[in-house]
A protein has these predicted regions:
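Cationic, low-complexity basic patches in intrinsically disordered or flexible, solvent-exposed regions
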Residues: 3
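Short, Lys/Arg-enriched N-terminal segments with co-localized hydrophobic residues
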Residues: 6-16
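Acidic/His-rich, divalent-metal-binding segments that scaffold phosphate/diphosphate chemistry
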Residues: 16-79
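Conserved active-site and cofactor/substrate-binding residues in soluble primary-metabolism enzymes
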Residues: 21, 41-45, 82, 119, ...
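Predominant activation on well-ordered alpha-helical scaffold segments within soluble catalytic domains
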Residues: 31, 44-47, 51, 85-88, ...
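Divalent metal-dependent catalytic cores for phosphoryl transfer on phosphate-bearing substrates
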Residues: 60-164, 174
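A structured, mid-to-C-terminal "fold-capping" secondary-structure block
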Residues: 154-204
Length: 204
């Protein structure tokens, strides 16, 4: 029963007894539905960013945060038209905890689902998902092709350029910052720092 844990204190929802997968189990499930290396790397980046913030704000539940990041786009490659809908079905079929399912689905709030980010962790996922893509695209324009020497100012400049990485929703990023009560500049700086902490591990 080592994978059945209580995260009730974290979610303020009482005792939770659904299955919380290990990171390895989650990766295996992710690869069952995703083969594109870009999608797999994005999942690892968002997972790493979530872990970075968890160590600051919720150190007792770092792996839970990382799992939410890893699985957030579980259905995107095979079911793009049902994104954040199909993944709920898949996770329920595997007996995953409803708290994890809610966290994963909530990053599609007002885009594909009406599952609202309620907890701080869910708001972090919602706010940083699109932003990691923008930062990654900005890094590729940098001479070093890496986030290592990137500045928040450079990211903010690209944020303002509507034609750059147009698939990264500026509205979602702004809304995420508002949900967290952070300024846009603060969100950019913190997320960039998170990605820089992962530069060696994920070759960013």
């Amino acid at each position: 029963m080592k994978h059945i844990v209580s995260i009730g204190h974290f979610l303020n929802r009482g005792v939770i007894m659904g299955k919380i997968p290990t990171m390895q189990e989650a990766r295996e499930l992710l690869k069952e539905y995703n083969q594109d290396e870009f999608h797999l790397k994005h999942a690892e980046i968002v997972s790493g960013v979530m872990g970075y913030f968890a160590r600051q704000y919720d150190p007792e539940h770092v792996e839970f945060w990382k799992l939410a990041g890893l699985l957030h786009d579980l259905d995107f490659e095979k079911y793009p038209e049902q994104h954040c809908i199909k993944e709920q079905e898949i996770m329920r079929e595997h007996g995953y905890d409803e708290a994890l399912i809610h966290a994963v689905a909530s990053h599609g709030y007002n885009l594909t689902v009406d599952v609202k980010p309620e907890k701080f962790m869910e708001k972090v996922l919602y706010a940083t998902d699109e932003l990691t893509g923008l930062i990654g695209a900005t890094a590729l324009m940098h001479p070093a092709k890496s986030v290592r020497g990137l500045s928040p100012k450079s990211v903010k400049k690209k944020f303002k350029s509507k034609g750059f990485a147009a698939g990264c929703s500026r509205d979602v990023i702004r809304n995420g910052a508002d949900m967290l009560g952070w300024t846009l500049d603060d969100l950019i700086a913190r997320t960039l720092a998170a990605m820089q902490s992962l530069a060696d591990e994920l070759n960013l």
